[in-house]
Curated annotation (Swiss-Prot):
Heme b binds at residue 96. The lineage of its organism: Eukaryota, Metazoa, Spiralia, Lophotrochozoa, Annelida. InterPro entries: Globin, Globin-like_OT, Globin-like_sf, Globin/Proto, Mb-like_M. GO terms for molecular function: heme binding; metal ion binding; oxygen binding; oxygen carrier activity. This is Globin, major polymeric component P1.
Length: 147
């Protein structure tokens, strides 16, 4: 599924609210905290340990979350050029091959946690639209990961 021009415009219009404040660092941290709470076995794969509550104070995890939110912001900025966006995200997926046992099946659950965190931050967020955007973003990353 490719997003329409109107959908891309809506995503771009809502991005400033999604990333407001600290540029998405807290949003990324909330995403990962939810993900690890629901999938504690994934902490080791992502290089973290300890209690999920303690991770809320991890500068390393906050940085990792911000990097992901920054990348989503770049993808949103490039969405009106699907080929460019796909190329950028494909390269990101290729880079993730070197980070250990990162697999395509990790992306859907992480996406659900991202959407939950986004909805908490921005009440009234168009979750259906953002879910479609996340699928496009993650599909391009996965293509690189599996190449």
């Amino acid at each position: 599924m490719h997003l329409t021009a109107d959908q891309v415009a809506a995503l771009k219009a809502s991005w400033p609210e999604v990333s407001a404040g600290d540029g998405g660092a807290q949003l990324g941290l909330e995403m990962f905290t939810k993900y690890f709470h629901e999938n504690p076995q994934m902490m080791f794969i992502f290089g973290y340990s300890g209690r999920t509550e303690a991770l809320k104070h991890s500068s390393k995890l906050q940085h990792h979350g911000k990097v992901i939110i920054d990348q989503i912001g770049k993808a949103v900025a490039e969405m009106d050029n699907a080929k460019q966006m796909a190329g950028t995200l494909h390269a990101l997926g290729v880079r993730h091959k070197g980070f250990g046992d990162i697999r395509a099946e990790f992306f859907p659950a992480l996406g659900m946690c991202l959407l939950d965190a986004m909805e908490e931050k921005v009440p009234g967020l168009n979750r259906t639209l953002w879910a479609a955007a996340y699928r496009e973003i993650s599909d391009a990353c996965i293509a690189g990961l599996q190449s």
